[in-house]
């Protein structure tokens, strides 16, 4: 490997989630902020989050006159 071109690796990077969970990992950044982690992700918690896309569907149907 060439010297001087690789970023500094931090073995104790703190990852902070929006839900309040924190954990450490390795990264080239000293601190990471994430919106979702294994403590709050629906796949790991078993809870479903419903994403509201009804407005987009209605807008599409209205634009192309697909109302029945």
Swiss-Prot record:
Binds the 23S rRNA. Pfam families: Ribosomal_L31 (PF01197). GO terms for biological process: translation. This is Large ribosomal subunit protein bL31. Belongs to the bacterial ribosomal protein bL31 family. Type A subfamily. It comes from Clostridium perfringens (strain 13 / Type A). Part of the 50S ribosomal subunit. Its cofactor is Zn(2+). Keywords: Metal-binding, Ribonucleoprotein, Ribosomal protein, RNA-binding, rRNA-binding, Zinc. One of its GO terms (cellular component) is ribonucleoprotein complex. GO terms for molecular function: metal ion binding; rRNA binding; structural constituent of ribosome. Gene3D superfamilies: Ribosomal protein L31. Zn(2+) binds at residues 17, 19, 37, 40. Binds 1 zinc ion per subunit.
